Curated annotation (Swiss-Prot):
The lineage of its organism: Eukaryota, Fungi, Dikarya, Ascomycota, Taphrinomycotina. CDD domains: ASKHA_NBD_HSP70_HSPA1 (cd10233). This is Probable heat shock protein ssa1. It comes from Schizosaccharomyces pombe (strain 972 / ATCC 24843). NCBIfam families: PRK00290.1 (NF001413). Pfam families: HSP70. The modification N-acetylserine is found at S2. One of its GO terms (biological process) is chaperone cofactor-dependent protein refolding.
Amino acid sequence: MSKSIGIDLGTTYSCVGHFSNNRVEIIANDQGNRTTPSYVAFTDTERLIGDAAKNQVAMNPHNTIFDAKRLIGRRFNDPEVQSDMKHWPFKVIEKDGKPLIQVEFKGETKTFTPEEISSMVLLKMRESAEAFLGGKVTDAVVTVPAYFNDSQRQATKDAGLIAGLNVLRIINEPTAAAIAYGLDRSNQHETNVLIFDLGGGTFDVSLLTIEEGIFEVKATAGDTHLGGEDFDSRLVNHFAQEFKRKNKKDITGNARAVRRLRTACERAKRTLSSSAQASIEIDSLYEGIDFYTSITRARFEELCADLFRNTMEPVEKVLRDSKIDKSSVNEIVLVGGSTRIPRIQKLVSDFFNGKEPCKSINPDEAVAYGAAVQAAILVGDTSEKTQDLLLLDVAPLSLGIETAGGVMTPLIKRNTTIPTKKSEVFSTYADNQPGVLIQVFEGERARTKDCNLLGKFELSGIPPAPRGVPQIEVTFDVDANGILNVSALEKGTGKTQKITITNDKGRLSKEEIDRMVSEAEKYKAEDEAETSRIQAKNHLESYAYSLRNSLDDPNLKDKVDASDKEAIDKAVKETIEWLDHNTTAAKDEYEDKQKELEGVANPIMAKIYQAGGAPGGAPGGMPGGAPGGAPGGADNGPEVEEVD
């Protein structure tokens, strides 16, 4: 059975699962947590990913990157990117219209694309899975918000490539959650299920029908820029104003203070899901001033009222698009950590006339769970639970081309089941027109200027003819990942031209991806080297201390000559002092220093053990690194066998 995994690559947290023996195992990371912060930090000495990165964010706000998902596949001048940049302590710069993240790493200024940062998080998830499954893992299904557009999907796929994954498929988060909900419910009747997925940074609503293992998405809607982070930001602004009112000081220019406040706000927000009030206590927040305050659930709900209300629009849109009345929705499934907010639960319940949402699936893990099932199916798992499962997803946005006068002419309407293929015949609008420019857009507006340009290509060499005579067949083909291929055929000459909409403006080239893959491997090797360097340092330190402790042991004290004890004491003291002054030495230096110390200690320790030694040896065994017994034995004492 192949070791395939499903990864929920979240804005704020990520999660990974594996399906085998008819069940999904959500895999904990090296800290024992089942979700991992989507954070990457760069320091003077190393790169940290996940919990380790988030834990040091207040000390290193400018070089700790989060929210890469809010940048991926977007343009630098996107208004949402511009508004986010006001909240981020790290620096985002522009290159060729794309946003790049700039950090100080090991004393140098480095820039990374959002794809590279996301790939580091994916790599961390992959490593957790490899540790758990015991072996190499490459096959993965990665999830994206249902409302992600073409370039965001493509960029997520690239992030997987950079992390060394074979991305079997990109699937939509609410659809993955629906699998988690429906896998164990084998009712034969058609069930209409509404998935309400509100996470850290994105929001999706999908309506599916589930019947005999067939999961068919009827419609999807959402906002790729709404989630828990936005609620945190409202709290941060609220408390920053309160601090200013009380202390006449503005903390918003101080990245460290704002970060500490944001962490406290996130904690308070979580507390308010179960309590009516939460207190915030931050010592020495700014210029030595302590900040103690509290907030009630009602005040929090008021601060975020408009954001909470906005979550209802996509619900209405999905019901309209799928032509299903809200009374026909059989189950409401809440996914994403932000759905724990009581106000959100009440809004959803009230909208559906008091119907209670399903509480039986874990909102943090459902998406990774479904992705793991889909990954198993794609690598050929045939267990009884998965053999009849079929997933039919939809294109979230209409896809079309620009026709005369800047009109958006859709070929594939939104909520069309994918994979799908559609062709239409167009013609020229001027006499003897030698070529046509085919511009591909996505969006719902009537004019292309209000839609998103995905890419364009030229079909040239059309023989001279009056307008309207040449026949140009344009074909749109959307694959199972929701990624579009477009081709055009001039029927008279048989000339064809095609492009995969790899969003020429936003997409990484093959060369860039190859470069990033090799850099990712280089960073991984550096991380491993840093780990082994620290191990060598710890080894030396614990050896020095265990030597010192051995000499203080009452059983050994009497058997050591004063001069020998002094020699070891001196060597240990020198080693510990050297360690204090050389915290960033190379691995070899630590190993050489350990050999030096062993050179002093081993002959003395051997002498003690030959003279009869302590009963049962030194407590805790020989100090690490000392050979077990006299080197080669000696003539006057008993022969000592070396033991491991």
